[in-house]
């Protein structure tokens, strides 16, 4: 049984840089698996990392969190990405669907 962590639209940047933004809560859950993780993106197996980036897009400094993997570049902008931990407890499973 998989554990759904979050759903969010695929950004226009993901296809260019292979980074899919995730919430701080999802990042904390994934970092518990290790900073380098097995990733399954719409059925394509890859290795990825969980990383943060400092940001000043708001008046107070903060961080944005990402899953980074080459397979993420195949995700289509505007689709909804559901990020889960697969039933094996160690693979990050990202599946995209058309928006509702």
Predicted regions and their residues:
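Acidic, low-complexity intrinsically disordered regions
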Residues: 1-100
């Amino acid at each position: 049984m998989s554990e759904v962590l979050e759903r969010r639209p695929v950004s226009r940047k993901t296809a260019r840089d292979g980074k899919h933004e995730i919430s701080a809560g999802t990042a904390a859950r994934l970092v518990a698996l290790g900073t380098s993780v097995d990733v399954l993106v719409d059925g394509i197996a890859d290795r990825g990392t969980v990383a943060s980036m400092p940001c000043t897009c708001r008046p107070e400094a903060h961080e944005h969190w990402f899953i980074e993997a080459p397979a993420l570049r195949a995700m289509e902008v505007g689709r909804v990405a559901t990020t889960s931990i697969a039933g094996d407890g160690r693979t990050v499973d990202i599946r995209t669907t058309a928006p509702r």
